[in-house]
């Protein structure tokens, strides 16, 4: 089975053997996905602990300072909030990409519509655990 290549910005390459549709290589796949997510700083998305940044309140089309409803935010505060949200969304998308590109097309169809990387990960783990011993041993 071929491997999936994930390169980082500093040219470090991580290789993961995709999860077999029958889950027979899950013992190898699971720690590699966790290490890859940890190396990319996105393990909290996989585990469901990522906290979405708070959005700035908008009143009459004007962004308000964090924690207020009547004081306009500065340009720096707006940019900071947008940067935090962009980073969060990019990291969430990266985690989803890792999961979707490292499972079989059949399993990808099952998980692609799930909202979070954690819900995808839970679905992958559940799918593997629901495979019978006979199915796992049948593939050699």
Predicted segments, located by residue:
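N-terminal Lys/Arg-enriched interaction segments
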Residues: 1-140
